[in-house]
């Protein structure tokens, strides 16, 4: 099977993934994607929260309504924490990523997202699917996490730790870019008393953070309810939403209002991967090819069958809690299991 390189769209949101402005961005990307529209929402940025499934679930509920004309299949991907049952290295949990043509990550902690995604199976799958045309939408904490350097918002704003600029997931390094992203750029939640601009840390601390960045670095600031859609294939960035985005380099900041566009190389010198497989482990592509082959043949993937068999054993032992847990895991991977008088019946959602 031949792998074809077709970069998807990347949308970075300053905030408001479930707002009117966010909905328009999602629809803009959905219009460009083939059917069926398969959306995977990664829980990782909020994986430390006890209600991380609800955080991602709110986005899922919004998209199921906002994109209802596209009849989306929406899966939550509970890749919450390394070394647990919900690890971002667990191929069973990550199954929806193999066929998703829209991947979404949202609120949480940027530094947590980086710690639990960097050099994982989950993140490599996201990068690979993007090179096959999948759209990527990042908002809030995820917008920060995918850049070259991270603003450790909670650590500075809530805990009072010293200002640092730790490495991020480096999504744009695949294109030769040294780019960091700061959402909530024009935030005013603090009113007249506290400067909460620049993602809540305020202008003074933001300037200190800037001084820690390497040379030839670009910072992308995104106002509230504003987004930037990056199209590497056409070489164009489009600003959408209610306000503007700002580009900070050595010269004076560039401000681009909503409704305008600019060349993608304004983000920095671009070098697109010459080969779709460049920089991504060969095993990732094998997983994707296997998933495509199974979809074409209509067969039940082996990992799904294993979960179904395990559930059968749990039911025979009267372990109903385990049975329900396995059912949920099967559903999270895009399959349904029904109990009949003749046994379990498995079908794709």
Give residue ranges: language-model regions.
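C-terminal and late-domain segments of enzyme folds
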Residues: 1-37, 41, 45-62, 66, ...
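General beta-strand structural signal in soluble alpha/beta enzymes
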Residues: 12, 75-76, 104-105, 136-139, ...
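Portal/gating segments that form or line small-molecule/metal binding sites
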Residues: 46-105, 112
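Catalytic nucleophile loop
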Residues: 104-107, 130-151
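Structural preference for alpha-helix termini/caps and helix-kink/transition segments
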Residues: 283-349
